């Protein structure tokens, strides 16, 4: 085998490889000899088929198999001899000219091909003990618990039919048809829709204008869709709704006590509050984890600067970009609605794709050097947890993951990432800081705005 390096720039490598015809032909002959004892051909006793006859029948297919294996082995040797770690499978370019292919298959010419490799960078890991993390911790207050309990009670409040006009807090059932400039718009009509006045569940200004309506009465309501409304076709537009009241109901008495807790399957109000406190605490812990993890990943990104495999970045970008375009299309929005241009958005998501690839490589390197692994039991538990999200379809979900290696890998990857993050947090300088609920969620709320 003759190997000539033709490119060694950045993370790109390219080689021209020549596999001698004599070696390929010898391997093909060995294959035919093995085949001789296995095939059954009419007119010949087992094992007595002449090699020349076998070659006329199977020579081309056997040589094709030999070439495929020889190329794979040659590429593997190149990688091993040069101490390379591949980011992607080798890209092989075999001869295309018909006469050249014919000569190689018939064992009359050497096989000359090119192979392009994209390799992983050498990563110099930093000192993780120098990473400083501020861990925001929010204590669940009694006020938060009481507020949540009240919301639960409001959601379970009964309503009783009433005579007269609707007031704030009442539930009014309406039919409505919305229009813009006199033309009805898609999704703007509804029948028998219950609206709790003051719940802020509808477009700003809609609920307030229902006050004073009695069953059987009609009214035109004028509103303006928010500029950040989900549908770009409606955002910022003035609309009119022709509304007909069907029924008005007054809220029943709201009594939050042990009896109310029992209607929810709990033994007492104290038990309800305990459950609510645990739920809020779990939400706070999740928010804290995200804040801490983001700081850690930012530190890793800032502390590890190296070239990343361009094809990996391109693949990551294309996946993200396709999802962005799909989301915009489904929402009927454009980049202008997001206060940006397509060019600016592409540049931003290109940066995000590069960051994701870099962090993925850093985390993988840390995991490999520290023997961090995801066990089969951990993956199984993840599948079970996933299956629980689809009541009645647990078996189908299990079978899907069992038969789909890529889907199983999609569960293993985040488990691995979280284990590496846990490992790093044990090393980093983590300082707790008590914050309010508002401070804990402020960053996420600003991002959502």
From Swiss-Prot:
Domain of life the protein comes from: Bacteria
Signal peptide position in this chain? none
Q: Which InterPro entries match?
A: PPIase_dom_sf, PPIase_FKBP_dom, Trig_fac, Trigger_fac_C, Trigger_fac_C_sf, Trigger_fac_ribosome-bd_bac, Trigger_fac_ribosome-bd_sf, Trigger_fact/SurA_dom_sf
Reaction(s) this enzyme catalyzes, per UniProt: [protein]-peptidylproline (omega=180) = [protein]-peptidylproline (omega=0)
Enzyme kind, highest EC tier: isomerase
Q: Localized where?
A: Cytoplasm
Record GO terms (molecular function) = peptidyl-prolyl cis-trans isomerase activity; protein folding chaperone; ribosome binding
The Enzyme Commission number assigned here is: 5.2.1.8
Lyase is among the record's keywords? no
The text the record gives for the protein's domains is: Consists of 3 domains; the N-terminus binds the ribosome, the middle domain has PPIase activity, while the C-terminus has intrinsic chaperone activity on its own.
Regarding protein family, the annotation reads: Belongs to the FKBP-type PPIase family. Tig subfamily.
Designated name of the protein: Trigger factor
Q: Which gene encodes it?
A: tig
